[in-house]
Curated annotation (Swiss-Prot):
The lineage of its organism: Bacteria, Bacillati, Bacillota, Bacilli, Bacillales. Its main location: membrane. It is a multi-pass membrane protein. Pathway: Protein modification; lipoprotein biosynthesis (diacylglyceryl transfer). Keywords: Cell membrane, Membrane, Transferase, Transmembrane, Transmembrane helix. This is Phosphatidylglycerol--prolipoprotein diacylglyceryl transferase. The keyword Transferase applies. One of its GO terms (cellular component) is plasma membrane. The gene is lgt. Belongs to the Lgt family. PROSITE patterns: LGT. GO terms for molecular function: phosphatidylglycerol-prolipoprotein diacylglyceryl transferase activity.
Amino acid sequence: MLLASVPQLDRVAIQLGPFPVYWYGIIIGTGVLLGLWLATREGERLGIPKDTFVDLVLIAVPIAILFARMYYVIFEWEYYAQNPSQIINIRQGGLAIHGGLIGAVITGVLFAKRRGLSFWKLADIAAPSILLGQAIGRWGNFMNQEAHGDEVTRQFLEGLHLPDFIINQMYIEGVYYHPTFLYESLWNFAGVILLLALRKVNLRRGELFFTYLIWYSVGRFFVEGLRTDSLMLGPLRIAQVMSIGLVVISIIFIIVRRKMGQADKRYLEN
């Protein structure tokens, strides 16, 4: 009875005959399109043809989704070994951002090499777009009622001055939960603003992308500590380990590239 008194959003956006179209996919797609728009706009300003990022997205997005799913399945193999038919079922979630990032970077490196372009220039331009996509994508987790934190009271959520639709969606099987999707989404939106501002600073090439990695990783580390559905390796939360690793690697790359003279070009240079 209590569950029925809390109105919640349906994870299915529309029904096309026997096929449900989930909000998760629509939201992810929206993030990709807005990120593409942002990247093509900046790319044209820096002399990169509009179709460059369109071509890159058409290749990188499917590969990123594949890697994101593979990453998730690997760390949840105990379940998927018993349910192999569910490995390809991504309609209700199960995509790991770090896996997708690995796939996107590999694709970007190969794409840039084939086109005779600077990977670091493409990565710098794409950095705000990637973070924007991540900020929007977290709302797909919201619709799926996943990637949440520990139990809290309704009074706690009301104390955060959240709208009712968020509070109600965080009511899962009789319990209210931390809206960690929201914390990460807001952190990422703030990061987008920071990266857009840093474009005007004219950083060394590649350092805008590393700033993105550092910013995202710091936020993800703390948010992950609140989550109850983390991918685990023994006692370790995989996302926290990856976040620490990305921060350290990014700082090392910035220092080493400067010392070796590989970061002499600036963001605005052609």
